[in-house]
Amino acid sequence: MRAVVQRVKKARVTVAGEEIATIGPGLLVFLGVGQQDGPADVEYLADKIAGLRIFADEDGKMNLSVRDTGGEVLAVSQFTLYGDCRKGRRPSFTAAAPPEQALNLYRQFVAALAARGLKVATGRFQADMLVALENDGPVTMLLDSQRLF
């Protein structure tokens, strides 16, 4: 399971001209689910993201988590995080989980964040979304449940 985590001042998701989710200060998380992923991957990333200290404390040091700041999380499913561009010019997405498996694990991930006391908004699974964000910093982290990076 892979995540691109961005510290934001605000973010929103629009589908077919309708705003379906919006958050204030917090994290925008793009989540990719791989074929081999399961509940342990969900728990690892939810725990890592909930506790990731990428917000400034009173001394200006990155020392606070989204939970510490009372920030929100916008979780957006993104299978393209499993795009393999090593061969040719067209990405291969064969490592991405099939939709049914990905939806199940995405829902588990959202629930795991909420269980850790976070307010979580979501994109719409398999929808063509417009995601707008105001990146804070910018601060962007790449996470992988297999600890590849």
From Swiss-Prot:
HAMAP family in alphabetical order: Deacylase_Dtd
Compartments in which it is found: Cytoplasm
Pfam families, A to Z: Tyr_Deacylase
NCBIfam families assigned: D-aminoacyl-tRNA deacylase (TIGR00256)
Locus of motif Gly-cisPro motif, important for rejection of L-amino acids: 137-138
Predominant subcellular localization, coarse grouping: cytoplasm
Coiled-coil blocks: none
The record's note on its domains: A Gly-cisPro motif from one monomer fits into the active site of the other monomer to allow specific chiral rejection of L-amino acids.
Keyword Ribosomal protein carried by entry: no
GO terms, molecular function: D-tyrosyl-tRNA(Tyr) deacylase activity; Gly-tRNA(Ala) deacylase activity; Ser(Gly)-tRNA(Ala) hydrolase activity; tRNA binding
Top-level taxon: Bacteria
EC number(s) per entry: 3.1.1.96
GO terms of biological process kind: D-amino acid catabolic process
Protein name per its UniProtKB record: D-aminoacyl-tRNA deacylase
Family designation: Belongs to the DTD family.
Lineage per the UniProt record: Bacteria, Bacillati, Bacillota, Clostridia, Moorellales
CDD domains: Dtyr_deacylase
Subunit organization: Homodimer.
Keywords, ordered alphabetically: Cytoplasm, Hydrolase, RNA-binding, tRNA-binding
